[in-house]
Amino acid sequence: MSQEFNECLKRYKLPEFDAAWGEIHRGIEKESLRVSADGHISLSSHPQALGSSLTNPFITTDFSESLLEFITPVYSDIDECMKTMEDIHRFTLQNLENDEMLWVASMPCPLDASEDIPIAQYGSSNVGKLKTLYRHGLSNRYGRLMQIISGIHYNFSMPESFWQPYADSCGFKGDLKDFKTEKYLHLIRNFHRYSWLLIYLFGASPAACKCFATDREHGLEQLDDYTLYMPDATCLRMGNLGYKSEAQKSLFVCYNDLDSYVDCLREAMNTPYPEYEAMGQSIDGEYLQLNTNLLQLENEFYSTIRPKRVVKSGQRPSEALTQDGIEYIEVRALDLNPYLPFGIDSEQIHFLDSFLLHCLLSESPECHKQEFFEVAGNLANVVEHGRDPELSLNLEGEPKKMRNWGSEILAEVDNAASLLDHIHGSTNYSSSLAAQSTKIADPDLTPSGRILKDMKEGGLSFFEFSVQQSRKHRDDLQDNGLSEATVKMMAETAAQSLKDQADIESLDTEGFDEYLKNWNDA
C-alpha cells in the first residue's frame, strides 16, 4: 500500500469525513438490445408506451431504435439505485409487444445484414435530427454492427461535503473547482492503469455469433457452427471485434490536466480526416455525417472512462468541462452480466465504489506516452487472454504475472473497502472484494469463465445460451413486481416526455441546414 494512501486512511476516519463516505453518488446507464421472442433484433419503432427517446429521463435509445438505454437518477443509496433499475426493466417489459425481450449479452444477437439495424429516430426537431445524423455518421464510419454492442456505464462522484475537508487535508488553498478537477483526473489516470482488472473480474463477452465477424479480420476460434470465441478471452466487447476505431488509434489523449484533455478532443473535432472527407458530409442533398473531422463530436471518442459534467442547453461537453470543471466520472468498461437480470448487481457496485475510491486516494503520477501505450497493451492482453493462468502484463517495462498483480491491487482496494464498511457499519464492501479475490484464484469463477463452461457443458451456441438467459429474465420480471404508484409515475413520465418532444419541435425557428452549420461553427 502506498504511503500516501495509508496516510489518507488515517485522516479520513476522522468525524468530519463520516457523512461524506455515506453519500457517495452513483448512477447507472444500461444498454440492452430489444429482440423478438425468438432472439432476433426487433425492427419495430421505439414503443410509444415508453415515451419519447429524446426526452424521457429513464428510457431512451442509444444507436438504434432497437438499442434501449435505461438511466437511473443519481443515488447515494445503492439499494435505491438498483430498485429504480429494476422498476425500469419491469415497466419496459410490461410495455413491449409480441413477447419481445431484452438481450442479456453485450455482444449482439444474430443478424442477416447490418443494414437491417434501424438507426435511432428522435423526431423532427433540429436537436432530434442532429442526434439521428450523428448516428448515421457512426454507421458510415464504423458500420452498424459495432454500434449495437451493449454495456453498462457507471457514473461515480464524491459528494460536496467531501471536497472541502479533503482539500484542507491536502493543504490546497485555491479554487475548490480546480481541486475537484485535479483529483478526478488523478482517479482517471489510476483507473487506466488498473482497468484491466475490471475487465478480468467482470468481462462477460468471451464469445460471439459467427455472423458478427463476417468480412472482418479476427483471431477467434470456432466453438460450433454458429459461435466464435477465444479460449481465455474475457471481454471481446473491448477488443478488435468490439469498440475499436482505426482512425482514433493514434490519438494520445492526455489526462494530466484538463486543458490538455480538452485541447486534444477539440483538435480531433476540428481536424479533417482524409477517409471521412472522401466520404463527404452529404451526397445529393442527403447528409451522411455531421462533419468530416476525425471526431464528429466529443462522445465519438472511445474510452474506458470519461470525465463528465451535466451540460446546459446548447452547451458542448468540452465547453462545460472548461467552464466549470469535472463533476463526475463515467466508467464505460463494463459488460452486461447475462446471469444478472439487470446486467449488474449491488455486490459489483460495492466493489466498484471501493476500487474507484482506491484510484482517487492512491498516488497517481502523470501519464507519459510510453505508459499510455503500455496500459493499452495490458488491456488488450487481458481482453483476449485474461483467464490464462500464466499471462504476464507489463509494469514500467517489466513483465509481471497478472494474477500476482491482481492480488496486490485487491489487497490495496481492501483498505478502501474496510474504510467504507467502517463508516456504514456493514461488511458489504469487504464481502464484495472477497468475492473478487476468488476469481483471481479460479478463472472459471469469472463471468467469462462461467459462460464458456455453461455453453460447453450444455452444448449451447452463444445464441442459444443468450436466448435462454434472456427468456429467463423476461419471465421472472414480467411477474407483477411494480407498485401501482410506480406504474403511474413511469406512465406519466412517458406521456409527459411525448409532450416535451412536441414542445421542442414547435419552438424551432431555423431550418436544419442552418442549424447544423451553426452547430459546427460553434
Locate predicted features.
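Short conserved micro-motifs at the rims of enzyme active sites and ligand-binding pockets
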Residues: L43-H46, M82, E115-D116, Y166-A167, ...
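Terminal catalytic/cofactor-binding subdomain
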Residues: M1-S139, M146-S150, F179-R189, R193-W196
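Histidine-centered divalent-metal-coordination microenvironment in nucleic-acid enzymes
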Residues: E31, M146-P159, Y328-D335
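Loop-rich catalytic cores of soluble enzymes, especially ATP-dependent carboxylate-amine ligases
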Residues: G123, K129-N140, I148, S157-L321, ...
